[in-house]
């Protein structure tokens, strides 16, 4: 049968723990330094000595290391910590490298109302050439956007891998946008063709029907006879419908 260590509870366990800490307290403490102050921290009624180290300012960037040879604070060297990141002041509008790019962007997308909205001829034109022409213009605009974004990325100070990653992501986004626009345009073209066929069928029916007479189906004739004759023998049943 296995043997287990004895268990202690209550006051007996507290006394044994206190004796154990007092027995090992001298093994881990270093010789006292007259220049360092000692503080006592009480943890669960057990006194443990903690050596107070030299202070380091936490809210300042200046570190004052302790010099054991000099006792005066005036002779202690001050080390200025260098900032991890340095920022330059914003350039003036005339020196801004992106001002020309911004101007070209505004000029590219300004005053393009004819290309950005459907005209009357484009709405009534059912040919595939119209859709293809619009897709070509969309592709051209997206290519210009990609070129300007690429220029902006190259102008910025970044690693080569980051620039390549952004360029690849923008190319993938461009291809995805073109595919979505192409699919939507083809669906629109199919709808327009279906509407044109229905319109042609209605026009053919109207052209063939030149008489002013209106023909009634069998159910309508029975209803008409019932209203005109007022005869009980002409009552309708559910089977008539």
Curated annotation (Swiss-Prot):
Residues 90-110 are annotated as: Binding to protein M2-1. Keywords: Host cytoplasm, Host-virus interaction, Inhibition of host NF-kappa-B by virus, Phosphoprotein, Viral RNA replication, Virion. GO terms for biological process: symbiont-mediated suppression of host NF-kappaB cascade; viral life cycle. Residues 58-78, 201-241 are annotated as: Disordered. Residues 81-87 are annotated as: Binding to host phosphatase PP1. Changing residue 172 to S: Almost complete loss of interaction with the nucleoprotein. Residues 39-57 are annotated as: Important for viral particle assembly. It comes from the Viruses. The record marks 108 as: Interaction with protein M2-1. The keyword Phosphoprotein applies. Residues 120-160 are annotated as: Oligomerization and binding to RNA-directed RNA polymerase L. Residues 232-241 are annotated as: Binding to the N-RNA complex. Constitutively phosphorylated by host. Phosphorylation at S-116, S-117, S-119, S-232 and S-237 is required for transcription inhibition by M2-2 and viral particle egress. Phosphorylation at S-232 and S-237 increases the affinity of the binding to the nucleoprotein. GO terms for cellular component: host cell cytoplasm; virion component. Changing residue 239 to A: Complete loss of interaction with the N-RNA complex. Residues 230-241 have a biased composition (Acidic residues). It is found in: Virion; Host cytoplasm. The modification Phosphoserine is found at residues 116-117, 119, 232, 237. Changing residue 233 to A: Complete loss of interaction with the N-RNA complex. Changing residue 98 to A: Complete loss of interaction with protein M2-1. Almost complete loss of viral transcription and loss of localization of protein M2-1 in inclusion bodies. Residues 216-232 are annotated as: Binding to RNA-directed RNA polymerase L. Changing residue 176 to G: Complete loss of interaction with the nucleoprotein. The modification Phosphothreonine is found at residue 108. Belongs to the pneumoviridae phosphoprotein P family. Plays critical roles in regulating RNA replication and transcription through its interactions with multiple proteins. Tethers the RNA-directed RNA polymerase L to the nucleoprotein-RNA complex. Recruits the M2-1 protein, a processivity factor that is required for efficient transcription of viral RNA. Acts as a chaperone for neo-synthesized nucleoprotein by forming an N-P complex that preserves N in a monomeric and RNA-free state and prevents the association of nascent N with host cell RNAs. Recruits the host phosphatase PP1 to inclusion bodies to regulate viral transcription. This is Phosphoprotein. It comes from Human respiratory syncytial virus A (strain A2). The lineage of its organism: Viruses, Riboviria, Orthornavirae, Negarnaviricota, Haploviricotina. The gene is P.
